[in-house]
Swiss-Prot record:
One of its GO terms (biological process) is alanyl-tRNA aminoacylation. Its EC number is 6.1.1.7. It comes from Renibacterium salmoninarum (strain ATCC 33209 / DSM 20767 / JCM 11484 / NBRC 15589 / NCIMB 2235). This is Alanine--tRNA ligase. GO terms for molecular function: alanine-tRNA ligase activity; aminoacyl-tRNA deacylase activity; ATP binding; tRNA binding; zinc ion binding. NCBIfam families: alaS. Zn(2+) binds at residues 581, 585, 684, 688. SMART domains: tRNA_SAD (SM00863). The lineage of its organism: Bacteria, Bacillati, Actinomycetota, Actinomycetes, Micrococcales.
Amino acid sequence: MKTQDIAQRWLDFFAAKGHTVVPSASLISADPSILFNIAGMVPFVPYLSGREKAPYDRATSVQKCIRTADIDEVGKTVRHGTFFQMCGNFSFGDYFKEGAITFAWELLTSSIADGGYGLDPSRLWATVYVDGTEKDEEARAIWRDKIGIPEERIQGTGKADNFWSTGQPGPGGPCSEIYYDLGAKYGQEGGPIVDETRYIEIWNLVFMQYQLSAVRSKTDFDIAGDLPNRNIDTGLGLERLAMILQGVENLYETDQVRPVLDAAAELAGKDYTSTVDPADPHHADDVRLRVVADHIRSALMLIADGVAPSNEGRGYVLRRLIRRAVRAMRLMGVEKPCLPALLPVSREAMKGFYPAVEEDFERISRIAYAEEKSFLRTIASGTARLDEAVTESKAKNQPLSGAEAFALHDTYGFPIDLTLEMAAEAGLAVDETGFRALMLEQRQRAQADSREKKSGHADLSAFNELLAQGQTVFTGYSELDGESAIRGLLSGGQPIAKASQGQEIELVLAETPFYAEAGGQAADTGLISGDGFVIEVLDVQRPVKDLSVHKAIVREGEVAIGASVRAAVDRERRHAAEQAHTGTHIVHAALHQILGPEALQRGSFNKAGYLRFDFAWGEGLSTATRSEIEEVANIAIRNNYSVQTTEMPIDEAKALGAMALFGENYGSRVRVVEIDGAWSRELCGGTHVDTTSRIGSLTLLGEQSVGYGNRRVEAFVGMDAFRHLAAERALVSELTEIMKVPSTQLADRIGATLAKLRATEKELDRLRKAQLTAAAGELTTKAQQVGKTRLLTHDVGQIGGADELRSLALDLRERLGSEAAVVALTGESNDRPMVLVATNEAARAAGVKAGALVKLAAGVLGGGGGGKDDVAQGGGSNVGQIPAALAAINQAVAAL
């Protein structure tokens, strides 16, 4: 039975039992605290935990999962894999232990004809929770009395294996696991408590029945009492069941994985033997083939779900998977790109249950192939240096130094895991501690540079002293002006007691309505005034956490520490910034609505009237897609959605599905901004309008790449959007006047005009080349004997480009024959001079080198250049020096 048929049979069985079939969620977890969905139950956590009411009483799914904690073990054993599929059935306050156990037994043991998997009941074992005096006798009784499993095939295990919790206070409960006996050749008799190689776990049934009040570890927790609603969460490993039903030795030989393994073996010219014995001569290659088979499938599925290679987070996991697969192939002798041969094989194996991998394969393959090419360049540049370093370290009988590992990372792009892997293969350890210390030092330098940019100074001691007096209280969420007092004055980062008119200062208030630049939102500006003085605030930064520093200039009077002030934010500018920030959230939600949840935020910036938003996406957006996004955004604005902000514990925010920027550090309490409830829900500390209609309108300006796998959209909002559209309308009107057509025909007329222009330019190029060719014969007569060679120097004037100049020079060199000859030509293109020199073999034998002559002439022209001894070219900036440049070449040749 094919894996996809096993999965479909699972869904059909539970659908017939009244379960709602829930499609697999993306591999990308909605929980910002984890990279990927690592288990089938993760998408159901809000329901299982009781934080949200489930929209169904029973559900079933086949969930895509990624786990990379044991990535280094992949291939070395036949049980570890990074991508897997978890079949699950869930009950939310409906059936409990007896229902879950009965369903599991029926599906596993019913015949194929009756819709089951047809497993031999005598080969199935069960475990139940037993830990000292705590025993799940209810589950044991169901297995024994209801199902009929002999007592000797029901074994008890403790908290470590048979009790589930979230790792924090909340729901928990005992588990019951189902094991399959693979047979005597796989190990000892005695059940799973004796040998989990022979007895393989296929299904785990979790009975959520307790409320845990404290969880200190997996085996140390307190049970507060029973849950009001008891839930069921089960998970069956699809690949493990496929292995059993397909009669193969391990997951690498199942129908979704083996084709890639075979294709890799054929490409490398290797025979796969399935060995896991390190002493076996085939072991190293078998491990590599298993790595390739696993990682190629994982990469395919990750890219399909919107992950793109990068140096952090999910993108780094994908990058590592691709690079490990490519390197495994190289270690088997395959140095050319291998993904074009292997990725389509994985697509064919997976498309039956996941049609998106075929529908989107053009994008998937483009991303994967580009990453492979990039990695091959990295290997080519860094491997030689690593080999040298390994040899030197071995000669000194020392590990590879942290400094060397850091240099490989910083200069050649070698990630530390690749250095560790390659060094280990050479039998050498790496000073990871030293490497980490240098990486930390680099980060600290970068952070110091960032702080210096924010404060204008490297020395932050004065700011830290002010912070010790108390944090800045921000009042700007609820008011735009208010009373305060000056707590600190600085100039050039140094404390001062007072400042007078015209002086640039940094000012710290006890409390302020001014928003300091943070979270992608630009700082407020405005005025701070007091008795006899006015200060203009130009910027607000936080050089140290919790301290707002106002960069300002004294416009009137004299100001001193301790003065009472009135701080007033520029209201119009703040409102425009709020329009942009709420607009950013709307664009984010619109991207998710049109592209899907994989369009993850990578960064954003918003200021008065303008926003930009960076997101993960592997290709450019079509004009139609951009229009859809813009329409969704403006519908949200027109609908006048309410914008609400709430502070809450971060766990509660996660449970609500609030989006966050992965990698950001959030405190235990966070601020959640909601637009129309769940339409948009994000963690955000910025300022916002109170209803979306206050934005007015939003106009996308365009979209572009900002690094591999990441895109950027920009937009105007409010009056800036209106002004932009008005300017566009005026431009269209002007163009219709120029082109003498209505606006509906403008694109066609401009296209036709450009086509004619290109045709004319092409004809001019042809005529110019023909003219040069015709003139070549006459030009050869201008060659003069200079020293030991015949030298032809000539300025051709306006020319199409360097290629034309080169073509003419080579033609002239050929016409001058085999005696020593040098051709030196100059020309002008786009108001800049060019020079090209060509020498024949006899001239080079006489000591004339084209590269040296071009370097000399280009220097005269105010530029540079060079090349080989036979042909070289250069350029400059001073067209008027062309005669002098040719004269310099003449003198240099004469001197040889």
